[in-house]
Amino acid sequence: IDHDACKRLVDRSITDDRIKELVYAQIDSHGTRGLGLGSEPNQILAVALPSPIDHLLLRTPCVLHSGRYMDDLYCIALDKADLHGVLSDIRAECEKLGIVINDKKTRIVKLSRGFTYLKKRFNYGETGKVIVRPCRSAVTRQRRKLKKLAAFVERGEMTREQALQSYQSWRGSMLKLDARRTVRAMDALFSQLFG
């Protein structure tokens, strides 16, 4: 996140010069680019800075639906050409805001082909039901993590209960998705590793 863009946002929102200086110091406290994680003011700035993009999408008639979670965004429209125009508008707005778009993660796809958003794979079933599964890399990462946790337990650096708690957290999030078979396979791996 561009610090100058954040400071311009603060200038428009805060009138007290002492508070402005305090917020500026917080913005600059973690280098020249980006904001420190965990700080409430930094999280507010990170969410507020791209809000002009949200307003742009609300004013664009061809966009049927759009949404954003932190710095991830999606738009739904009927025509691919319209989406290319919207993407150009978003790029122009991002340039004004000092936001850099990751071209590797930016794409226009047919909804029927499916897409990955927030580490989840979205597809349509034959009946039109939206099927949400975990992306493959998340499952692979968890499998590796379980093996590392088993090594920690074996060396006595962690208890089995702590490993179970970590696994149950991941498992609970997977049960909200269409991932029953994945969860069963991971349960089998957990039983194999931890007995």
Regions found by a protein language model. Give the residues of each.
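Conserved polymerase palm-domain catalytic core
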Residues: 1-70, 74-89, 99, 109, ...
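Right-hand nucleic-acid polymerase module
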Residues: 29-30, 81-88, 101-195
